[in-house]
Amino acid sequence: MSSPKQTPMIAQYLSIKAAHPETLLFFRMGDFYELFFDDAKQAAEALNIALTSRGKSEGEPIPMAGIPVHARQTYLNKLIEAGFKVAICEQMEPPGASKGPVRREVVRTVTPGTLTEESLLSPRENNYLVSYLPAAKRHPHALAALDLSTGEFFALTLEREDQVAAELSRLEPAELLIPDNWEPEPWLKGWKRCLSRRGSWSFDGKEGARVLLEHFQVTSLESFGVADSPPCLGVCGALLHYCRETQKEALSHITGLSRLHQQEGMVLDETCRRNLELNYNLKDGSRKSSLLGVMDRCITPMGSRLLAQWINRPLQSLDAIATRQESVSWLRENLVAYQDLRERLRMVHDLERFLSRIALRRASPRDLGGLRQTLQCLPQLYAILTPADGHSLAVPSLLRILADHFNGHEALTKQLEQQLADELPLNLKEGETIRLGFDQTLDTLRSLSRDGKSYLTKLEVEEREKTGIPSLKIKYHRSFGYSMEVTKTHLDKVPPRYIQRQTMTNGVRYVTEELKEYEEQLLTAEERMLEREQLLFEALAEQVARQAETLQASARAIATLDVLANFAHIAEERNYCRPLLHEGAVIEINQGRHPVVEQFSDTPFVANDIRLDNRQRTGLITGPNMAGKSTLMRQVALIVLLAHTGACVPAGSAKIGRVDRIFTRVGASDDLAGGRSTFMVEMTETAHILHHASERSLVILDEIGRGTSTYDGLSIAWAVAEHIHTQCQARTLFATHYHELTQLESQLDGVFNLTVEVKEWKDQILFLHTIVRGAADRSYGIHVAQLAGLPRAVTRRAREVLADLEEHAVHHPDSMGQGHAPASQPYQLTLFEDAPPSPALLELKRVDPDELTPKEALEALYRLKELL
């Protein structure tokens, strides 16, 4: 409730602000948006604009900052990038239309997860708004994601927190909605900046079902796949409710909802994405030299966004993969069609985001112009994929399905061609959006606005001839408007139809009904012209919005075609092969190359062969640094991943047994914010692999156990290798400097040694980057140090120390060097000591469940409970 000392305007501001406490309120006052109180202070600092004051509140000046209305988008961009939410409050009536302050309403709240403006979005990246409902006793975790800028909407349930974390790393939400009665767990800290708390009631399954039924105008949600999942209903409903509340629109472009199932896609956790540099490189965090960076040669933004989705969620269905592969192969074999498709796609615009802005009433004339040009291209794309020479049956089924979505837009295309001008302005208020000749009323208003002066000149000549007054002139006066001026000498010739308006010293000013009518038309022509053009434009946009569902299907078809053509383009350009995927365990890659390193190498990339199967499941790789161990392992992982997207791969040939997850433990750094050392980070990531890897997984391990003492590190690395091989039974590549691990080849069936060839010449080494069977006999660490630029005195001394250590390791294994007493391995404190066995565990080990009757089993359960 406002203080009685507040002005009516400030009282109105405070009332509106109270309803939007988490936002900066852009309060429209004439040609400016003003911000007051704390909002003004925050905006002034973030935007580097002046902080002033206006009036007083409780005796203190009210802080105020403002931005011009015409510059709103520029300042809005800066605030959103800084993490703010902004509520835009407009004047809903002309000043003076009512007593008291002008009526104002918030027409939209702009948040990081609800952006649609081109200037606020990256064209080749999705902008997901995600809602999350944590697991409870009766339901699993649930996530829903919506890209408001494209209309993509899906949900899924997950059993474990690590699965939720992996999905969030895939989606990279711009904003994450959570219930306000839930305190985020530590694992969610990485998303703290984008959290938005919402009323827990909005996550209720029944409320979600009501919102979805109302939005989609259906009586059942069975076809969407979420009807049997209250958690899915809850997160979907929370998303839609939030978007309605912030956008103040019907969201007509959200025409569908799909339910994803985790088993349908390969699981890639955040560590894997980071280590394999799928989306961003580790050097500077940009897309350059990431997998996506080198694989994205898509023509359209829609294609680039879909490619990112495919790379971040590879398929598990071999049939679905083969369907994509067939289309890529057809495009490679039909070079003319493939080149023609790529050329036609250059004329296609971002149809998905156009439709979003059209549905939300934010479309510009050029959005509709881009839609027109895109629709004009569709018949050409259809013709390429359905050749008239009778060979259409040779076109793969996926391409034929895509082609079907390019039909059916002829009427809308014609309407856009007839109604829109050829050259379109950026802004509707600039005029000239509707084609000349389409609307007679608009044409008349344009003539009035454009040709008013010539009309008055013509009228002036006509009146002189009719009245015989040669000095008659039509002039404009600010106070009286247009009038005909007649000098005193010709007043006797003034006809009765002239109406006297003003007497002057040397004559009289007159008007006629015709001039009065024209004056009214002329003075309001510009305003009425813009109103008429806006009316016609909005009607056309509404026509488009009503066809959103079919247009979105066409947009998805364009994106899919673009990605498939992109795969064909890269395969041809870089000599990639089509991999054979199968349900077996064999991963066999002949002449494989790293898809990223190859593109940035100044010298020809050295290809390598690798084979993993049930007989040789764990490859232990030894060799010096810089020799190529890490490159090889990442290369194998990336080839496997690309194969599961349907793409061709950088190899001479490849057979890939289906992989459900890729795990990587490559490099590590301190987690200072989390209070974890490099070694703790390494062990945490390794533990995650040991708990979740299966025989269907591919595991990449690089230098386990480096962050502790030599013996501890060796022991851990040995135990980890054994566990993964014997318990997880995952297909594994394990690079290590612990040469002792090579003994596992003779101890465990299926473990085999690999090494990187090195050539020595005159105290120099040459890395051949070739992987061969066998174990390395030296680490060449000093050679690498010399290459890195260590002073010669240091490397010379290092060789002396190494020679001394090696000599005494052979002749005096218990001595560290000449003159030293035998040394024992120093005791290292451990975090966890072995605890005595639990009585309950001992009792449980004695129980044979196959020998118990139901009554005995129940009694055993009670005994165990008493022992806990």
Curated annotation (Swiss-Prot):
Belongs to the DNA mismatch repair MutS family. InterPro entries: DNA_mismatch_repair_MutS, DNA_mismatch_repair_MutS-lik_N, DNA_mismatch_repair_MutS/MSH, DNA_mismatch_repair_MutS_C, DNA_mismatch_repair_MutS_clamp, DNA_mismatch_repair_MutS_core, DNA_mismatch_repair_MutS_N, DNA_mismatch_repair_MutS_sf. The lineage of its organism: Bacteria, Pseudomonadati, Pseudomonadota, Alphaproteobacteria, Magnetococcales. SMART domains: MUTSac (SM00534), MUTSd (SM00533). This is DNA mismatch repair protein MutS. It comes from Magnetococcus marinus (strain ATCC BAA-1437 / JCM 17883 / MC-1). The keyword Signal does not apply. It comes from the Bacteria. Pfam families: MutS_I, MutS_II, MutS_III, MutS_IV, MutS_V. Keywords: ATP-binding, DNA damage, DNA repair, DNA-binding, Nucleotide-binding.
